[in-house]
Design a protein with these regions (language model features):
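Extracellular polysaccharide-degrading/modifying enzymes targeting complex plant/algal/animal polysaccharides
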Residues: 5-329, 334
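Extracellular beta-rich repeat passengers
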Residues: 122-123, 153, 275-279, 476-565
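Surface-exposed loop/turn motifs in large extracellular/passenger domains
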Residues: 37-39, 59-64, 259-267, 296-305, ...
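Short glycine/acidic-rich loop motifs that flank beta-strands on beta-rich extracellular proteins
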Residues: 52-53, 255-256, 277-283, 322, ...
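C-terminal structured domain segments across diverse proteins
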Residues: 397-399, 404, 412-417, 421-484, ...
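Acidic/polar low-complexity surface segments
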Residues: 245-249, 273-324, 336-337, 346, ...
Length: 566
């Protein structure tokens, strides 16, 4: 194998040797192609800044991209970044830092590696009325707002929308807020429900409002002022002790870092992918979230009947939040020992292809989910740690798969996420084995530590298996440890452990479950509907042990096996 080296301190006119490395990934890729794909590209430590997405295709089949010293104690840490370092700060009298950033557009900011949230206030001031075009309030405070974004958390218990404002004007004694279209129009079409006799239409009142300079009240937050096109101003209220001369402030610019399409046997090892954004929620279309990583872009909606006159509407088709690293229609690709952090969308997506493996990776500090896998065969998602994801798109699962065949999700740890830990939509032959989820569903509701919906096969041989998982602390209201939902069928749920859940599991859902078996599970409270299982559910040999110490002792072998293997 040809050995190629690349370093931020290198030079593309050099030969790409260990002593005289290339400077850019593009030059290293060209050299690897010249070697017919039989090459290992060693990335030296430091920040490899991209100015455009790094593309890998069929011509790159067989190439390995890995950290220098990969697998050795002296392994280096190469960071593939789509960010721009912000300098030239001036400090206002009130302590706010200001930087002229031209036409920079971003939704995130990182200070010394820490995520700085956008400045926000809770909801709209005054007495507020929702209309078909926006809102009316008797407060004059919004008249000074510019480029703000409305966040609508919990329109449905599992949704969080983000919508833009088109204009704010005074009309008599009222302030009229006109929302941007088509986003607000789509929200009005999608969010229609009746629950316990109460009808609701539209997104309702915002639960928070983000990104106006007047909101800079909490240290460690930022605003991007875009009032003057092409002359944007970044504003940051520092934490105590932070100084502009010594702080490293990075604004993500690219939306995609790496796109790998149509390749075979490519390996990514020991790399850090960081500092990318996703600008779509800030556009007039907004982010009309429906479920998980899916959002609505108009089109037909239908009712999901919940019984007793209750219903919600749902889209017949939805779009998936993109990932900052994308693998498409690739076979035999390996992603091992990588970290996905400080990203403005999903960390990694796998779509199509066969035999893609994601192992021993870390996913943290992400606006969206950790990993999404769609329409692929024989994928393996194993021994990964997912923590602190869904920081801006709260419905995002830690790990989500849909439309797959023979996918294995095993020995992962998913913790501290706002909604579901592991989600499996309709598919065939999914195996969810020996995972650990903890402190999931911290923000939104009606989800599960492990959640499945839709048909999972057409027989016991082709169905899903959920075995040996340990699910802890889904404690927020109206949530479940194990959740087979919305017409799930051909699912075997056995030998799992559920502790400290609002509800351990639920057996009665709509549409009803078919050919679902709960067998030999352990939990600290009986599932909802255990005493009267529906006809489509087999419920046998499950054990309820209310005492935590006794439950732990009885399930120690299962718990020892769950989670990331050393």
């Amino acid at each position: 194998m040809e050995q190629i080296h690349v370093s931020p301190a290198g030079d593309d006119s050099w030969p790409g040797s260990q002593d005289r490395p290339f400077a850019t990934l593009e030059r290293a890729r060209a050299a690897a192609r010249e070697a017919g794909g039989k090459a290992v590209v060693h990335l030296r430590g430091g920040v490899h800044v991209l100015t455009r997405p790094f593309e890998l295709g069929a011509d790159d089949s067989g190439t390995v991209y890995q950290a220098a010293g990969y697998g050795a104690p002296e392994q280096e840490e190469p960071v593939i970044s789509g960010g721009r370092e912000i300098t030239g700060w001036r400090v206002r009298d009130d302590g706010v830092w200001l930087a002229e950033v031209g036409d920079l557009d971003t939704r995130q900011l990182y200070v010394n590696g820490r995520r700085a949230p956008r400045a926000a206030v809770p909801g709209l001031p005054g007495t507020v009325t929702a209309t078909e075009t926006g809102y009316v309030t008797d407060s004059s405070e919004p008249l000074s707002w510019q480029n703000v974004e409305f966040v609508h958390r919990g329109v449905y218990p599992w949704t969080e929308a983000r919508l833009q404002v088109a204009g704010i004007a005074r009309a008599g004694g009222s302030t009229v807020i006109t929302m941007a279209r088509p986003g607000y129009e789509w929200a009005y079409a999608l969010y229609q429900s009746v629950y316990e006799g109460n009808a609701s239409i539209g997104p309702g009142l915002p639960t928070s409002v983000e990104n106006d300079p007047s909101f800079l009240r909490e240290p460690g937050t930022f605003v991007l002022d875009r009032a003057r096109p092409g002359a944007h101003v970044l504003m940051y209220l520092p934490l105590p002790g932070e100084e502009p001369a010594s702080a490293r402030v990075v604004a993500p610019v690219l939306e995609t870092l790496v796109r790998l399409a149509g390749a075979r046997e490519v390996a990514l090892r020991g790399l850090v992918f960081a500092e990318a954004t996703w600008l779509r929620p800030g556009r007039p279309e907004g982010f009309v979230h429906y479920h998980g990583s899916g959002f609505y872009e108009g089109g037909p909606v239908e009712r999901a009947e919940l019984g007793e006159g209750s219903y919600v509407t749902y889209p017949l088709s939805s779009v998936t939040v993109p990932a900052c690293v994308q693998i498409e229609d690739a076979d035999g690709v390996e992603v091992t020992g990588c970290r996905f952090t400080r990203l403005g969308a999903t960390g990694l997506s796998v779509s199509g292809g066969d035999g893609v493996a994601v192992r021993r990776c870390a996913f943290d500090t992400l606006a969206g989910g950790g990993v999404t896998v769609t329409g692929t065969r024989s994928a393996a998602i194993e021994d990964n740690r997912v923590r602190g994801t869904g920081l801006e798109l709260s419905g995002s699962p830690g790990i989500a798969i849909s439309g797959t065949r023979g996918c294995v999700v095993a020995h992962n740890e998913v913790t501290d996420v706002p909604h579901c830990g592991i989600v499996a939509g309709a598919g065939e032959g999914t195996h969810i084995l020996h995972n650990l989820t903890a402190r999931t569903l911290q923000v939104l509701a009606d989800g599960g530590g492990v959640y499945l919906s839709g048909p999972q096969g057409d027989s016991a041989d082709t169905g899903a298996v959920v075995r040996g998982n340990v699910i802890k602390d889904t404690v927020t209201p109206y949530n479940f440890g194990l959740y087979t939902d919305y017409g799930a069928s051909w699912v075997l749920v056995e030998e799992n452990v559920v502790m400290r859940a609002d509800n351990t599991a639920v057996l009665h859902v709509g549409p009803p479950l078919e050919n679902v078996t709960y067998r030999g599970n352990f939990w600290d409270a009986d599932p909802v509907g255990h005493d009267d299982p529906p006809s489509g559910v087999t419920y046998e040999g499950n054990v309820t042990i209310a005492d935590e110490g006794a439950l732990t002792a009885a399930t120690q072998a299962i718990q020892d096996r769950a989670g990331v293997r050393s």
